[in-house]
Amino acid sequence: SSDLRNLAIRGRKIIDKVIRHVEYARSEINAIGDYYAYAKELADGDAVFDFDVTKLSIFTRSLGLAGIEVYDLLRDEYDIQTEFGDIANLLAYVSIGDRPKDVERLVAALAEIRRNYRKDPSKTLKMEYIDPTVACGPQDAFYAEKESLPIAETCGRICSEFVMCYPPGIPILAPGEQITEEILTYIRYAKKKGCQITGPEDMSIQRLNVMTER
């Protein structure tokens, strides 16, 4: 196709243009204040091997807003569709079809969101990852006798189903893991901020399935 031919002939030049747009956006967003657009400094050769410079990932918690809240504001108030937001970050892609004025529009919208919607960052949830406490194997937990309890009564019990927060879609709980107050706080916070909770039988997340105690 003509698109493939164009990429084969001018691919390097096209990607270099995208990278310039993203680097400009990254610099301008960091200059706004309260946002942090991640860059190559994350790549330490250990925990982070490399960094995709074409992705614009922005930390929003210092703004007092979850990434999903900024995502919703961009979509609803500014007609800007980004990739996704979670409880602390926003992800935007800059494509080969984006123009400098598209990048400027995103930067301007983020600056206006900071002016108009900034909140107290001390009220945001600080944890993004919780180390699981594994009490038994997932297969044993999944097929064990179970009961459904109100979520407030599940602390200390062993979960028998998956609970995932989208985005990013990584399990908060898996069968065989112990439910802690920290995990329950995370679930409530993510739900309040507008993240979609998937996996449990009760999609309203009012109840959770846990292993029956013997």
Regions found by a protein language model. Give the residues of each.
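Conserved C-terminal alpha-helix-loop-beta "cap" of PLP-dependent enzymes
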Residues: 23-199
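Long alpha-helical, hydrophobic tracts
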Residues: 6-9
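Charge-dense polyanion-binding interfaces
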Residues: 196-214
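Substrate-binding/catalytic subdomain of NAD(P)-dependent oxidoreductase enzymes
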Residues: 11-22, 56
